[in-house]
């Protein structure tokens, strides 16, 4: 009996949320930084697949990736709703981790004007800015690769977008601003992730969904500023600022005790309202 239990446990990883990895044709990372950029593809069961795909850009301050919470758990949730999840391993700046971080100024949500052009990066420096650009190239390559495999993966080419968490939101925003037709997302969602560079809204900007917490310093103000940039350009944007609960947000138990735990349901409802899922 014990042998049977052990054998069944060995097969658990193979039957739970199987995924494939694909390397991206982008620049190799610097020595000591991250692994080669790649995507991990999590596909829903074919009988519930609705043709929508989301490239997940995990957070981690551009120094690590919050993979378990922002990709693995989120992919499982999305697959349950028939959505393909594409985890993105993008360029990082790991070599900066041992140098310490200067404490940035703390900007309250009531002062979005503190971030002209919605640039909420409190500590610009050459190496950090270049990493953001490299990560944005990875994100654009991810969208292109999903479109190339769209028929194989049962994905609609006009239903591929981003969901960025924290720094990953900044990566997704940067990618959206400089994308060509093949790289352009159909939608852009950022969860407590403001822009890390000056925002220039593209002429054909995708619909934007923003979620954040009111008392999140810098982030909330930066995201209000991002919303305003999108609206000033005449683009479609929706902003949700939660007043309670802890952030940043990952998938939460639905206890009914906070409003922040409803963000994942809000995401699904928004995708339905925009016609990306049935």
Task: Map each language-model feature to its residues.
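Residue-level signal for short, function-critical loop segments
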Residues: 45, 60, 166, 214-216
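Serine-hydrolase catalytic machinery in alpha/beta-hydrolase-like enzymes
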Residues: 26-54, 59-153
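Structural recognition of the beta-strand scaffold that forms the well-ordered cores
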Residues: 53-57, 85-89, 159-164, 173, ...
């Amino acid at each position: 009996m014990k042998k049977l239990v052990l054998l069944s446990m060995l097969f658990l990883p193979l039957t739970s949320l199987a995924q494939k990895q694909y390397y991206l044709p982008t620049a190799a990372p610097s020595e000591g930084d991250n692994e080669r950029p790649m995507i991990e593809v999590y596909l829903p069961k074919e009988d519930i697949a609705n043709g929508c795909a989301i490239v997940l850009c995990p957070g981690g301050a551009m120094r690590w990736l919050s993979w378990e919470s922002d990709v693995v758990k989120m992919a499982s949730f999305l697959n349950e709703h028939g959505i393909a999840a594409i985890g993105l391993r993008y360029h990082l700046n790991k070599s900066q981790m041992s140098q310490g971080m200067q404490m940035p100024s703390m900007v309250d949500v009531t002062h979005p004007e503190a971030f002209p052009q919605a640039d909420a990066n409190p500590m610009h420096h050459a190496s950090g800015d270049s990493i953001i650009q490299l990560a944005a190239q990875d994100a654009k390559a991810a969208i292109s690769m999903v479109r190339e495999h769209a028929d194989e993966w049962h994905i609609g080419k006009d239903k591929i977008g981003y969901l960025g968490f924290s720094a990953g939101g900044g990566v997704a925003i940067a990618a959206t601003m400089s994308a060509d037709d093949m790289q352009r997302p159909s939608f852009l969602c950022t969860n407590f992730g403001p822009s890390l560079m000056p925002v220039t809204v593209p002429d054909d900007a995708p619909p934007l969904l923003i979620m954040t917490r009111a008392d999140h310093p810098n982030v909330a103000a930066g995201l209000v500023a991002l919303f305003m940039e999108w609206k000033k350009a005449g683009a479609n944007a929706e902003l949700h600022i939660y007043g309670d609960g802890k952030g940043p947000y990952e998938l939460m138990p639905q206890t009914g005790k906070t409003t922040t735990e409803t963000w994942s349901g809000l995401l699904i409802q928004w995708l339905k309202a925009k016609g990306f899922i049935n």
